[in-house]
Amino acid sequence: MRIALGADHAGYLLKVAVAKHLANHGHDVIDHGTDSEESVDYPPYCAAVGRSVVSGDAEFGIVLGGSGQGEAIAANKVRGIRAALCENEYTARLAREHNNANVLSLGGRILAPIFALAIVDVFLSATFQGGRHTRRLAQITDIEEEECL
C-alpha cells in the first residue's frame, strides 16, 4: 500500500516511527513533512496528505500532531477525505468498518509509539462493511457536496 504521511512539529517523532513501521511492513510511504521538531503550522501538511489520497497517489493517509484534533479537522477540509482521530484500536477499526475513513489522525503527545503503531495496523487492515453504512456515507457526501458549492 502507498500511505501518505504528514505531521507538524508535535507529531514529527511519531511520524518517523510510523514511517519506519510502514516501510518495515512493505508499504510505500509518501512523506509530506515536516522534517524536524521546529515549530510549524499543521494545516498545509494535512491538506497535502488529503490531496494525495483524493488524487489516488496514496491509498490512505496518516496525519500526526500534538493531539491529532486539528490535524483531523484540517484534513477533513479536503473534499472526499474522511479523517478519523483514533486513540485506540477499537475506534480505528470502526473508523474503517463503519465510516470508510481514508485518513487516520494520531496525537503524538497522547499516544506512546507502541500504541500508535497498533492503531495504524488495525486501521490499515480493517475494511469497510458497507450495508447500512453505505447509506450513511452517501448522506455525508451529499452534505459535503452541498456545502462545497
Where do the protein language model's features map onto the residues?
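A short beta-strand-loop structural module common to alpha/beta enzyme folds
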Residues: 28-39
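Alpha-helical segments flanking ligand/cofactor-binding loops in enzyme cores
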Residues: 20, 47, 51, 73, ...
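Residues that form or flank phosphate/diphosphate-binding pockets in enzymes
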Residues: 13-14, 40, 70, 114
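Helix-adjacent hinge/juxtasegments
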Residues: 45-85
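Short helix-loop-beta junction
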Residues: 20-29, 80
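C-terminal binding/interaction regions
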Residues: 2-6, 10, 89-149
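Glycine-rich phosphate/diphosphate-binding loop of Rossmann-like nucleotide-binding domains
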Residues: 4-24
